[in-house]
């Protein structure tokens, strides 16, 4: 009898070991994905959260009109699992979008436009040069925000000393950790691709103005920076856009947006397609 009990205990221990190993294997080797594609915005776009002056109309997302002192934001409605606390894994992601900055005068444009990653409960921050995403030029780890800015107005307190319009990567501060000078083509559509490689922690930004079918007339800018997302943003985040105006202004519009992320070591997926 004792021998039978011992055999049963051994069997259950072996079974439990196999079960736990199997669960761990599938957890480590599974992938959680989030994907969506918006090729044309609708007036009642259900998968966006609007903040400030952001709204959709006529197939586009308008963050600000060309008027003074406005802040407009739009967030994807579903939180994104950007890294996993149990495994330590971080998601690879790529997002692409087209946007237009259109000002009455190409010389007097403000303030700019961002794509950002922030806590789920994110709210509009300071306007003007802070682009509705940050409140300080000093590093603030409680911000838990990474942004890619397309900055059209020079602020002496934190912008590059060359005073040029620029693309910047911002980590917990409006003062960019890396910048690339950028010649705004007023009223022209820009194509942007932002990609994050979790293996290297490299965030890559590419902006292209395909203003002609002739290859030599395509203007392109690329910016790279190491950004340890897991050390900056929460495990679950929201992604979105923000734009602001000040004493000078411009209309800031997004015409299309897609996003795809893959997080290894989890076991669920979310996909959405929006025409």
From Swiss-Prot:
Q: Which InterPro entries match?
A: ConA-like_dom_sf (IPR013320), L-lectin (IPR016363), Lectin_LegA_CS (IPR000985), Lectin_legB_Mn/Ca_BS (IPR019825), Legume_lectin_dom (IPR001220), Leguminous_Lectin (IPR050258)
Signal sequence residues? 1-30
What SUPFAM superfamilies would the database entry show? Concanavalin A-like lectins/glucanases
Residues at which Mn(2+) binds: 149, 151, 159, 166
Q: How is it modified after translation?
A: The mature form consists of two chains, alpha and beta, produced by cleavage of the immature protein. These remain cleaved, yet fold together to form one subunit.
**Propeptide cleavage-removed residue intervals:** 211-217, 270-275
Single GO molecular function: D-mannose binding
Q: Does the keyword Manganese apply?
A: yes
Which Pfam families does the protein's record reference?
Answer: Lectin_legB (PF00139)
Q: Which domain of life is it from?
A: Eukaryota
* Chain positions recorded as D-glucose binding sites: 111, 129, 246-247
What are the UniProt keywords, alphabetically?
Calcium, Lectin, Manganese, Mannose-binding, Metal-binding, Signal
Residues that bind Ca(2+): 151, 153, 155, 159
Where in the chain is the site Cleavage? 210-211, 217-218
UniProt KW Manganese keyword: yes
The record's misc note reads:
Binds two manganese (or other transition metal) ions and two calcium ions per heterotetramer. The metal ions are essential for the saccharide-binding activity.
Family statement drawn from the similarity comment of this UniProt entry: Belongs to the leguminous lectin family.
According to its UniProt entry, what is the function of this protein? D-mannose specific lectin.
UniProt subunit comment: Heterotetramer of two alpha and two beta chains.
Q: What is this protein called?
A: Lectin
Q: Which organism is it from?
A: Lens culinaris subsp. orientalis
